[in-house]
Structures are given as structure tokens and as C-alpha cells.
């Protein structure tokens, strides 16, 4: 990785996640369940751990109870080796105020950097689905001599207003010439007019440069104190920002299908689509890569069970993920992800859907193109995802593409 260098990891996990409502009504965005048994933050932490980072803090703020609990119960490295993953809420060290942005979160936590005295700081978001070897990015950063290196991936021009967009220096393509946060008029890549180079929200900083940058930013009254909107453009203006091409990152166990996969799951539609990427026989993103595992809480649960019901009707699943503790009894599950301890009962059908923990789909109910949060009950004979107008009238969120979302603990009646 960085021979002789001390590396420190910071995960920015204080985001509110308004675009994922109602899934973020009672939890922080990084705590949203994903892929059956995971939380979104598990992907960032797994990548850091697999990259041999051993001192990591998670900066939390918004409705962080379930996130803090997940980190404390799940992520417990060996403390005897000075390894830790610690959840750090806003400490109000610089006054009686909460974090006012991602850069301010680092400023208010600067004591952590003073205590550990790292040479390099890896800063990542907590709400993307991907695999990445940060050791390779750190080596690229050290070789470049940049103060900050930004991981980048190509994205369609139509999505540019969702990302920080990078323009490189033609004479020195490893350097960032311009960085614009969520532009409405992006500059496309010269060699690929339909694409832009987007920031992945992953950064490698020289530690002293990061500390100086967040302090400078704190003195700017017009700043939003945001990493992408303020800190990175400051480095670009100083000629100190480099870019790391994600397609140069080779993760052990990757295949041609899922190599360089990266998903921002900040909207309901992208969250739903990312689940669809998991479930085919040859998935676009492979959860089963043993060489670069995605870690999560080890559930003390029985195996999933797919059985006939009392009348002998078969329980069937097609192209689906079924988590521990779940039971499909005389029901049909297709192109769906079923969370732990969920039940799909006789004659019920769940198609093209994402079902969270402890949901109950009663006999002859139907769920299609829907996301059901924890503890949802779909009563016998009830349906979700059939009539978008009726779903909206019942108070459910329905996206323009027709994905219905049912909030935590809701009882859906016929």
C-alpha cells in the first residue's frame, strides 16, 4: 500500500438521505438495509478493511442510532493490534452546533487526526455499492505528488447533475483542471461525448493538506463546507488535485461482468435498480466474491426455507435472493430480494421487489415492483404495485418509474 506511511480512514456517514424517503424516515442513509442482509455502510467499510486499513472512524449525525448500533455490533477489529472502527457523532468541540457539511464534520473531528498523526487520510462516502482496493489508489496518490487524489468513473451526461464532474488537464491527464459539483451544463469527455468523468466521493489526502484545507474553508463565510462543493475545488484552484481512474483498479476475484461496478443508490429508483443487479445467474454485481468479501453482521438465524404449504402447493423462487430465517410457504418469489425473517405465505406472489426484515406477506397477497421496509404486513388478498394511483392515495411513495415504497411497520389492507 503506502510503505512506511500511516493510513487513517474516515467514512462520512452523516447524510440525511432525503431522496430515499421513506426508507430514511427513522434511520440514517448509510444504515438502510441492502441486498438482504447488509447495510449500505458495509460496502465502504468492507473495502477499507480488505484494503488493510485498520484505524477507521465513521462520522455520524442524522438519526444515527441504528447505524451506531450496527457498527458497534458488527465491526469489531482486534483492539490489541491497535485496530478499530469507531462511530463518532458530532462532538460540538468548536461550539454549540452540529455538522454543517462534510468538510465541517472533518474540521470538528480534527482532534482524531491530531491524536493519530497519520501521513495519509482516506475519506469515503457511506452510501455507494462497489468494490475497490484503496491500496492501489494510495500508491497512485503517493506517486503523483498531489495533495488530494479523487477517484473517478465515467457516467452518462444525463446523470451529471447528480455528481461532482471532473475535467482533466489535456497536457497532464492525471491532474484535475476543473471540478464542478452537480453541474446543469456539464462538459463531456472529448473522446466520448455522451459521458462525463464523475467523482465517486472517494478521496486520498495528504494529512497535513487536508487539515489546512478544512481550516481555510471554515473561514470562508460563503462556503457550504462540503467536500465536493468546496474542498476539492480549492485544491483544484491551487493546482494540487489529481485524479485516479477507477478502471485501473483491479480487485481480486472480480469478473468481466462486475469489474468496475459502482452504484450511487441515493434515489429510490437507483436503490431498486442496484438490487436488480444482484439477482441474475450472472450478476452485474457479485455478492459471492470470496476473495474480496462484503462483511456484515453475522445473524444468529436458521437457514431460509422454501416449502409446500398445508395443501401441498409448492413454494417457488426464480432469480431471487432469500436471506436467513425467511420462509416461502406455497408462495412464489421472482426477481426479488427477501430480507431476514421475512415470510411469504400460501398463494402470495412477490415479483420484482425488495422486501426488508420481518415483513409478512399473507396468503394470496401480491407485491410487484415495490420496496417494503421492516415489519410491513401485506394482509391476505391485498396488493401493492398494481395501481400506482391507488398506492399514492393510500399514502405510499410511488416514483415516476412506478416503484412503490411502503414505510416501516405499515399494515397494508385489501
From Swiss-Prot:
Keywords tagged on the record: ATP-binding, Carbohydrate metabolism, Glycogen biosynthesis, Glycogen metabolism, Nucleotide-binding, Nucleotidyltransferase, Transferase
E.C. number(s) listed in UniProt: 2.7.7.27
One Gene Ontology molecular-function label: ATP binding
Signal sequence residues: none
Pathway(s) it belongs to: Glycan biosynthesis; glycogen biosynthesis
Catalysed reactions listed for this entry: alpha-D-glucose 1-phosphate + ATP + H(+) = ADP-alpha-D-glucose + diphosphate
SUPFAM superfamilies: Nucleotide-diphospho-sugar transferases, Trimeric LpxA-like enzymes
Pfam families: Hexapep_GlmU (PF24894), NTP_transferase (PF00483)
Residues bound to alpha-D-glucose 1-phosphate: 164, 181-182, 199
Domain of life: Bacteria
GO biological process, one term: glycogen biosynthetic process
Family statement drawn from the similarity comment of this UniProt entry: Belongs to the bacterial/plant glucose-1-phosphate adenylyltransferase family.
Assembly and binders: Homotetramer.
Protein name: Glucose-1-phosphate adenylyltransferase
Lineage: Bacteria, Bacillati, Actinomycetota, Actinomycetes, Micrococcales
Gene designation: glgC
Amino acid at each position: 500500500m503506502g510503505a512506511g506511511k500511516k493510513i487513517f480512514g474516515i467514512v462520512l456517514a452523516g447524510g440525511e438521505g432525503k431522496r430515499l424517503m421513506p426508507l430514511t424516515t427513522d434511520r440514517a442513509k448509510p444504515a438502510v438495509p441492502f441486498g438482504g442482509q447488509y447495510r449500505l455502510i458495509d460496502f465502504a467499510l468492507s473495502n477499507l478493511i480488505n484494503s488493510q486499513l485498520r484505524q477507521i472512524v465513521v462520522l455520524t449525525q442524522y438519526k444515527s442510532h441504528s447505524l451506531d448500533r450496527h457498527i458497534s455490533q458488527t465491526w469489531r477489529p482486534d483492539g490489541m493490534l491497535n485496530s478499530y472502527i469507531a462511530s463518532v457523532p458530532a462532538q460540538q468541540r468548536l461550539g454549540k452546533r452540529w455538522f454543517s457539511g462534510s468538510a465541517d464534520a472533518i474540521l470538528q473531528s480534527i482532534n482524531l487526526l491530531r491524536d493519530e498523526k497519520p501521513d495519509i487520510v482516506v475519506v469515503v462516502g457511506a452510501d455507494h455499492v462497489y468494490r475497490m482496493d484503496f491500496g492501489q489508489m494510495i500508491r497512485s496518490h503517493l506517486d503523483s505528488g498531489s495533495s488530494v487524489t479523487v477517484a473517478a468513473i465515467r457516467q452518462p451526461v444525463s446523470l451529471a447533475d447528480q455528481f461532482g464532474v471532473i475535467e482533466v488537464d489535456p497536457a497532464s491527464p492525471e491532474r484535475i483542471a476543473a471540478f464542478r459539483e452537480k453541474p446543469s451544463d456539464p462538459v463531456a469527455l472529448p473522446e466520448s461525448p455522451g459521458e462525463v468523468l464523475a467523482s465517486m466521493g472517494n478521496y486520498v489526502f495528504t494529512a497535513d493538506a487536508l487539515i489546512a484545507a478544512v481550516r481555510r474553508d471554515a473561514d470562508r463565510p460563503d462556503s457550504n463546507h462540503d467536500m465536493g462543493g468546496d474542498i476539492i475545488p480549492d485544491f483544484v484552484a491551487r493546482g494540487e488535485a489529481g485524479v485516479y481512474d477507477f478502471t485501473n483498479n483491479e480487485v481480486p476475484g472480480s469478473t468481466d461482468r462486475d469489474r468496475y461496478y459502482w452504484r450511487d443508490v441515493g434515489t429510490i429508483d437507483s436503490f431498486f435498480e442496484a438490487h436488480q443487479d444482484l439477482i441474475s445467474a450472472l450478476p452485474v454485481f457479485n455478492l459471492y466474491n470470496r476473495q474480496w468479501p462484503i462483511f456484515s453482521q453475522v445473524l444468529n438465524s436458521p437457514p431460509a426455507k422454501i416449502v409446500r404449504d398445508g395443501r401441498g402447493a409448492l413454494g417457488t423462487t426464480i432469480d431471487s435472493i432469500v436471506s436467513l430465517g425467511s420462509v416461502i410457504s406455497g408462495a412464489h418469489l421472482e426477481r426479488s430480494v427477501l430480507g431476514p425473517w421475512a415470510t411469504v405465505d400460501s398463494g402470495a406472489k412477490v415479483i420484482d421487489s425488495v422486501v426488508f426484515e420481518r415483513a409478512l406477506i399473507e396468503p394470496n397477497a401480491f407485491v410487484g415492483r415495490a420496496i417494503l421496509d421492516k415489519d410491513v404486513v401485506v394482509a391476505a388478498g391485498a396488493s401493492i404495485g398494481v395501481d400506482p394511483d391507488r398506492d399514492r392515495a393510500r399514502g405510499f411513495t410511488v416514483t415516476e418509474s412506478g416503484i412503490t415504497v411502503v414505510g416501516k411497520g405499515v399494515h397494508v389492507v385489501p
